[in-house]
Amino acid sequence: MYRAKRAALSPKVKRRVGKYELGRTIGEGTFAKVRFAKNTENDEPVAIKILDKEKVQKHRLVEQIRREICTMKLVKHPNVVRLFEVMGSKARIFIVLEYVTGGELFEIIATNGRLKEEEARKYFQQLINAVDYCHSRGVYHRDLKLENLLLDASGNLKVSDFGLSALTEQVKADGLLHTTCGTPNYVAPEVIEDRGYDGAAADIWSCGVILYVLLAGFLPFEDDNIIALYKKISEAQFTCPSWFSTGAKKLITRILDPNPTTRITISQILEDPWFKKGYKPPVFDEKYETSFDDVDAAFGDSEDRHVKEETEDQPTSMNAFELISLNQALNLDNLFEAKKEYKRETRFTSQCPPKEIITKIEEAAKPLGFDIQKKNYKMRMENLKAGRKGNLNVATEVFQVAPSLHVVELKKAKGDTLEFQKFYRTLSTQLKDVVWKCDGEVEGNGAAA
């Protein structure tokens, strides 16, 4: 039971990209995966969007993504998720982004329902601030939806995925953008009809849908039949609930205009009476220096400028059941095995790092005439000189009990048990600086196995 349970365990793997240690996956799409990461230099959390170079090249999006990343490096607005840097390896592009801790605005609506008008207006004002800033720099979102609106620890809005529209958009010969819709409920009529569209007008429509959801708690356009849904969007078939104020109704109606040429613009939204109530323009420092060297390196072919991807295996963890089983007095294996006068295996604990433990064992075993084979935190030691029962072969593995406590197990895999005991006594003498507590003394009487 004990051995079978351990066999099912597998080593933990730490993956590093440059100075970042990657953690769990927090998002995934067709072209990219987003993983939580930690900057090992300052312990700051970040989110890293990982793109597959082969997929990007296959869809001929390299230059567009490169251009949009360069533009996004210039965007430093308090209501937009920040792009810190870009790295590249032979196979991947890594976009390092600000990690926002407050969750999605979508979750708040899904859990608690609609917002009060004052709160909805505050978030809408912050959304328009972000959209206006990015549009003024030629950056469009084109996939604005509640799920892309995050909140920081202070409850301020942060728009994610701004400027990375190339992952879902393509420019055709007419010079206009074309797309296949990911979330049709938020998408403007001209986008659904794929007739080519202006990115700014499409973003404004999506902002109108978002404002409606914040105030109503549900979408303005919904239908189980996708064709019927498209018809409702194309004709702007929606009604405002009775609790909407007159000012909110007027603004939403002007935003959800199916004709992009007559739809309200951001400059007009900023002058709208309902919008202006309690409005405070954002104040932030735009003085900064931006380098694009990292972008050139990420997309370049020079391997000297590529970031290193490193995989670091961690020792297998032991659970509470296994720790109890290690205690000789409670070792459940003894219930099923004949009494052993001679030990074929032994263990010790160590407070040293696992790599140091493996290195010290190797340094102690080699002078004793042992050939060493290592893989991760497992080691096979074989005596090159044959003994009474052939070559002594010892299997060793390091297990993690806690971050700073490890159990080292040595088992006789082949050869004479007496020779194994003698080897361990000599080895443990050499490992005084590594061994914290031993698994009892090796017994020296009885018949050898």
UniProtKB/Swiss-Prot annotation:
CDD domains: CIPK_C, STKc_SnRK3. Residues 313-337 form the NAF domain. Highly expressed in leaf blade and leaf sheath, but not in other tissues. The active site is at residue 143. Its EC number is 2.7.11.1. Induction: By salt, cold, calcium, sucrose and cytokinins in young seedlings, and by light in the shoot of etiolated seedlings. Induction by cold inhibited by the calcium ionophore A23187. Induction by calcium inhibited by the Ca(2+)-channel blocker La(3+), and by A23187. Residues 161-190 are annotated as: Activation loop. SUPFAM superfamilies: KA1-like, Protein kinase-like (PK-like). Residues 20-275 form the Protein kinase domain. Autophosphorylated. InterPro entries: KA1/Ssp2_C, Kinase-like_dom_sf, NAF/FISL_domain, NAF_dom, Prot_kinase_dom, Protein_kinase_ATP_BS, Ser/Thr_kinase_AS. Gene3D superfamilies: Kinase associated domain 1, KA1, Phosphorylase Kinase, domain 1, Transferase(Phosphotransferase) domain 1. ATP binds at residues 26-34, 49. Involved in cold stress tolerance. CIPK serine-threonine protein kinases interact with CBL proteins. Binding of a CBL protein to the regulatory NAF domain of CIPK protein lead to the activation of the kinase in a calcium-dependent manner. The activation loop within the kinase domain is the target of phosphorylation/activation by upstream protein kinases. The N-terminal region containing the kinase domain is responsible for the autophosphorylation. May interact with CBL3. This is CBL-interacting protein kinase 31.
